[in-house]
């Protein structure tokens, strides 16, 4: 529980966006100014079932690479990084796709377990904190990744206390993501036969005992199918033994047979 997002937190964050000319006219002290250097937006294949792999998030990779190119910097040169952290898997996927070590400091807010929601508003806290960080260390930059949906929508921003030499830049590498292959999905009735477990989750009852298995499997033709099982013994084994990659079978009703 302590690793996942906690929406029962009473917090607020805000920022004011305006031109440098307006900030000067309003008398905002120069050391309070923070400049967005670059931004990108893109999304994975919308339907999770169509994504080629559940362990890769190419839109994060393309979006992250592009925003760094636009900002003319690298993550090694950026001091302050905040990755969206609704669940541990989100941080792991983001870090993997961006080439960041999990040993690096990957949040400047403490993450969603401490910042709450709702939904993408967490990133307002991340941007506001990045602003405070670069104000205090104006020679440094901040990098923020925002995520929405089932690790579906991604936005990236690079921020600094000094203006970008060539002005703010924005782009979307969506065409690169859209060009990637999609996994075909075979209907349950047509998927009966041998398969290989690609991913699975074991749901537990109120007493904490395994109750239902839900799994994605890959068929011989490379397509994906979904199946379930109420075999509690198998569920218990799946909690203690890695089953990804193991051969199984599914019947015409979508039941997993080990």
Where are these predicted regions, by residue range?
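Phosphate/pyrophosphate-binding loops at sites that engage ATP/ADP/AMP, CoA/4′-phosphopantetheine
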Residues: 64-77, 189, 232-236
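OB-fold/S1-family single-stranded nucleic acid-binding modules
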Residues: 253-258
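Short glycine/threonine-rich loop-to-helix capping motif typified by GTGT followed
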Residues: 85-102, 117-122, 151-162
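Condensing-enzyme catalytic core mediating Claisen C-C bond formation in acyl metabolism
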Residues: 1-55, 128-129, 136-137, 145-226
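Conserved catalytic cysteine-centered active-site region
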Residues: 3, 37-44, 54-59, 63, ...
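Extended, hydrophobic alpha-helical segments in both membrane/secreted and soluble proteins
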Residues: 60-68, 77-94, 127
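Beta-strand/loop nucleic-acid-binding surfaces
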Residues: 222-239
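Short nucleic-acid-contacting surface segments enriched for D/E, G, S/T with interspersed K/R
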Residues: 234-251
